[in-house]
């Protein structure tokens, strides 16, 4: 039977901002004494971390990993670039990638409540608080992504600027071409496509582009206008659609052409299943 009331537990959580499990542990260790429990949590480096939660986080790092468990991408933000390159912070981020892969989780709130792979006695959120205490800055897990591992696919990851920008490319129909997938990921970081192909461009974005083009060519015959719009839309698609872009390592071929060559070599259909492009703060 617990030696503390629910009201005391509630007060401890309000005063410290620490998770339920650790608050229960603190009160149990301190025989239900609220003040001693606060001190107990402070010694663990948990209580004071909540005071940093309001601080703005514009810097950080994006980390990604792919293995037999799937593919994980995480973005974690801090206040300064100095801490973003701190070894303790980087270790915490690497641990988060492992947590996402181990638990196959795709939601930040759910991840925060799970046991940390770095310290099973702490939840991910509690370890975040401990790490905040160590580095002296607010830490915010901005977003995470988990992609399940499936058969006959290749995943390529490219990181630029020490984790400021990361791209992931998933190729289907090919199981041993991580180098090709990585080349495409490198291209994505350089060319910054917004969409996979023409078909994935939203109707509203396409309508806006047509409106902009039309406003520039008023007063011409409709047949001429239609031809100009078609040509300019082709340029638009080349700018924003991955498969329409000229390959950064060989501009004589598009990404779609590169995929077609891989399909021909393999004797089966190879496709870009999906891609991710994350930039810090974007």
UniProtKB/Swiss-Prot annotation:
It holds the Pfam family EF_TS. Coiled coil: none annotated. It is found in: Cytoplasm. GO terms for molecular function: translation elongation factor activity. It comes from the Bacteria. InterPro entries: EF-Ts_dimer_sf, Transl_elong_EFTs/EF1B, Transl_elong_EFTs/EF1B_dimer, Transl_elong_Ts_CS, UBA-like_sf. Keywords: Cytoplasm, Elongation factor, Protein biosynthesis. SUPFAM superfamilies: Elongation factor Ts (EF-Ts), dimerisation domain (SSF54713), UBA-like (SSF46934). GO terms for cellular component: cytoplasm. Belongs to the EF-Ts family. This is Elongation factor Ts. The gene is tsf.
